[in-house]
Regions:
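Hydrophobic alpha-helical transmembrane segments of multi-pass inner membrane proteins, especially
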Residues: 1-119, 161-222, 246, 250
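Glycine/serine-rich anion-binding loops at beta->alpha junctions
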Residues: 1-3, 45-47, 51, 134, ...
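Long extracytoplasmic/lumenal interhelical loops at the membrane interface
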Residues: 130, 134-170, 197
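A juxtamembrane structural motif centered on a specific transmembrane helix
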Residues: 215-260
């Protein structure tokens, strides 16, 4: 959890120090890539594929916002396609790149109905709960899927499903609206801030925040594989909450102490 904010702080400080004319030169692009890959590799060893991918995305996104030329990202995307191809080709081989449970998650994402009582149980129950909420929901503490324990992990990764079942489409959109207000505040703070470090730091925190809630919501709706990413400010978990509040404290500091 600490690495999410530490990585953003390092990249913001790096690009604040680096002259703008050097931002896209190969040598100066390589260093932040190495710094991003080190914690990503450590998280991947846990193994936590979802968080490691989001660290890469957040780091790469901040590099783009700092002004790194788009050609580097085109090369990364091309390499990513090659890696994904290798991942699928390695399945069942002695050198397979993912664990068996990670391949099962991909299979479940592509066809959850193939094993509705096994690997596809989580996402199947999640979709049932989302659909049963309707426009206004079943009412607080009245959700059948979540309260009768049909829905696993309802207090952590799948808490958005519980909210949508009990408060319906209106409740889900209201939460999205609150998230959007936070993102807008961060972006406006970054735009108005003349200090490059504070601006990049605020944008990096906003990007991290967006990626985690977007992936969580996509995951519980079946639009992305189940990767164990919590819903910011809502899911159960002390360390994630503390780190996120620290990040928002930095945003507030950037807003209050911005050069006039």
């Amino acid at each position: 959890e600490l690495m999410k904010i530490t990585l953003v702080m390092f990249l913001a400080a790096y690009y604040d120090w680096l002259p703008a004319k050097r931002v896209s030169r190969p040598f100066w692009v390589l260093l932040p890539i190495v710094i991003i890959c080190i914690p990503t590799a450590l998280v991947l060893q846990q193994p936590d594929l979802g968080t490691s991918i989001l660290l890469l995305a957040a780091g790469g996104g901040l590099m783009f916002l700092a002004g790194v030329h788009w050609a580097y990202f085109a090369a990364v995307i091309g390499s990513g396609v090659a890696v994904i191809t290798a991942v699928f080709q390695s399945r069942g081989e002695s050198w397979q790149l993912l664990n068996d449970y990670q391949y099962r998650r991909i299979d479940t994402f592509l066809d959850p109905a193939a094993d509705p009582l096994g690997a596809g149980y989580h996402i199947t129950q999640s979709k049932i709960a989302l659909g049963s909420g309707g426009w206004t929901g079943r009412g607080f503490m009245q959700g059948t899927q979540s309260r009768l324990n049909f829905l696993p992990e309802k207090h952590t990764d799948f808490i958005f499903t519980t909210l949508a079942e009990e408060f319906g489409f209106v409740g889900a959109i209201s939460l999205l609206g609150l998230y959007a207000l936070i993102i807008v505040f961060c972006v406006v703070t970054a735009i108005r801030n003349k200090d490059r470090f504070s601006s990049l730091l605020t944008l990096g925190i906003a990007l991290n925040f967006f990626l985690f809630f977007a992936v969580n919501m996509a995951m519980v709706m079946g639009l992305a594989p189940v990767v164990g990413v919590p819903l910011p400010l809502v899911s159960y978990g002390g360390s994630a909450m503390v780190v996120l509040l620290q990040a928002f404290g930095l945003v507030q500091s950037a807003h209050v102490h911005r050069p006039r």
